[in-house]
Amino acid sequence: MLNMIRMELYRMFKTKSLYVIWLVLAAGILFTTGLSADEMKTYTMEEKQEMYEYATGQQKSDTVNLGMDVTVPTKPGDTVSVFDLFYGNIKGKFLALFMVIFAVLYSTADMTSGFIKNIAGQVRDRRGLVFAKGVSLFVYTVLTMLIFTGIQTVSNALFFDEFVFGPVKEFLQYAGIQTLLHFALLIIVMCIAIVLRNNVISMMLSVCLCMNVLVIFYSFLDNLIAKAHIKNFHVLEYTVTGNISFLETNVTAKMAVTALAVSIAFVIVMIEVCSTVFKKRDI
């Protein structure tokens, strides 16, 4: 198992798309931070208050809009902090979009090659290969979060007159839970990619997850559940993408428990489904 994990990590760090996506992500963060800095200078106090209330959920119900929506939760009169922009990009799934693209490319890179056929014939249990990919994606998730934090910190120092990081304890709590949620999202994407064995369809479905397209389907399920006389139940609250959006900067115990439970449940189920399909498939 350790050899398979080392092999997958070696393959991941040899993948050119890993570094290309990181570079594009860095450029995107620098560009969007520069735009945010310019826009904040033009907003009135009323507009800043409205944006703050919207970003912190004070002006909306428990729903998620279609598409990407990055809003900075900075209080009127305060300087935009690293935590504010980190939160805005995470909540809007800006970071998740880059991560799922890599997850699809990495998960399907060797599915049709002679390499995977050769390796699968040598191991006792093919499911170990899926687990090894999962470990590699966890390492990728942690590294991407660290890189994102570093680039966002540099961007804030470059584009804002005053540098403010934000409350460190709250940041670590939020970032830690979001790391696990994003890892769960990548495991879901990996499962989709390996089961379907089609880059185009897998990429489309993964992007749809980040664009909240499935909200329409979740609303349909909510209506069916409501007709069964089950009140105040929302499917979105028990999905990975829903928890990525709903998690607030001031993480409560309920938010943390729900997010952790959903993440762990999806990771276990998706790896089991993916490994079972991969084990039985004729490669």
Each model region followed by its residue ranges:
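Aromatic- and glycine-rich beta-strand/loop motifs that create alpha-glucan
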Residues: 1-25
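Junction motif at the cytosolic side of a transmembrane helix
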Residues: 11, 262-283
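Short loop-to-helix capping motifs
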Residues: 15-16, 124-125, 197-199
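Secretory targeting signals
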Residues: 22-106, 130-200, 206-207, 211-215, ...
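Transmembrane helix boundary and interhelical loop/hinge segments in multi-pass membrane proteins
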Residues: 103-122, 126, 134
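Short hydrophobic, aromatic-rich alpha-helical segments embedded in or entering the lipid bilayer
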Residues: 224-248
